[in-house]
């Protein structure tokens, strides 16, 4: 969950709502106008919508099947206060949204893989499209929802997904990444922009 109050604006933007009661209390304690952007439809990102008050809600058509409310974002929206909302292709979930503001792009879970009982996988086509979208983002910092290192350099994150894409096999629509992880969920081979080892959950 992220709160953004652009300078000179009377609106607080909130990216995702989480599920715990404390998060709902924090949202309801915000004074003034509140706009909420939901990254995707998974329960850990939307459940508090039932408990909070807001002025506007932005979702994709897939997410609206679950929220039953909100303005559908098809493509991208740019607001006078500098907030930008857009869709991003994702293997993790259909209908993913990201939020950009100044030097930061909040990607939610969009970069994460698809989880099955026996495999962690990326769809090759969606991964290619996701990387292209990430390359087009002008913000130098990416923020990934569940990572220990919430804020990471754009190029550092891109290197990881380019490595994953390079593992694709001819004729296969998916890339298995089971062996790309440490036991704690961190990526085995990743470095930040300074060459330091970092752990990134996919």
Which residues are covered by each model-predicted region?
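Short amphipathic alpha-helical segments
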Residues: 48-51, 70-71, 119, 155-157
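Eukaryotic N-terminal low-complexity, Ser/Thr- and Lys/Arg-rich leader segments
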Residues: 201-202
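Short, hinge-like loop/turn segments at secondary-structure boundaries
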Residues: 55-56, 124, 160-161
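Active-site metal-binding motif and surrounding structural segment of the metallo-beta-lactamase
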Residues: 21-63, 138-141
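Active-site flanking residues adjacent to catalytic metal/cofactor-binding acidic residues
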Residues: 15-17, 39, 59-60, 106-109, ...
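Divalent-metal (often Zn2+) His-rich catalytic cores of metallo-beta-lactamase-fold enzymes
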Residues: 128-198
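Active-site environment of divalent metal-dependent phosphoester hydrolases
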Residues: 20-22, 41-48, 64-67, 93-95, ...
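Catalytic core of the metallo-beta-lactamase
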Residues: 1-32, 69-130
């Amino acid at each position: 969950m992220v709160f953004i109050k652009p300078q000179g604006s009377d609106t607080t933007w909130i990216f995702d709502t989480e599920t715990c009661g404390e998060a709902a209390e924090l949202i309801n304690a915000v004074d003034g106008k509140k706009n909420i952007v939901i990254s995707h439809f998974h329960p850990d990102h939307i459940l508090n919508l039932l408990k909070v008050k807001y002025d506007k809600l932005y979702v994709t058509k897939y997410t609206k099947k679950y929220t039953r409310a909100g303005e559908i974002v098809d493509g991208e929206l740019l607001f006078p206060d500098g907030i930008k909302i857009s869709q991003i292709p994702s293997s993790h979930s259909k209908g993913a949204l990201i939020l950009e503001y100044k030097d930061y792009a909040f990607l939610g879970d969009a970069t994460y893989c698809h989880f099955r009982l026996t495999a962690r996988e990326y769809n090759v086509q969606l991964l290619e499209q996701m990387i292209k979208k990430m390359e087009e983002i002008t913000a130098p910092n990416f923020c990934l929802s569940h990572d220990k290192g919430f804020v990471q350099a754009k190029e550092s994150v891109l290197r990881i997904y380019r490595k994953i894409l390079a593992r694709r096999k001819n004729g296969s629509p998916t890339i298995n990444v089971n062996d790309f992880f440490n036991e704690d969920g961190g990526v085995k081979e990743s470095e930040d922009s300074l060459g330091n080892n970092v752990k990134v959950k996919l």
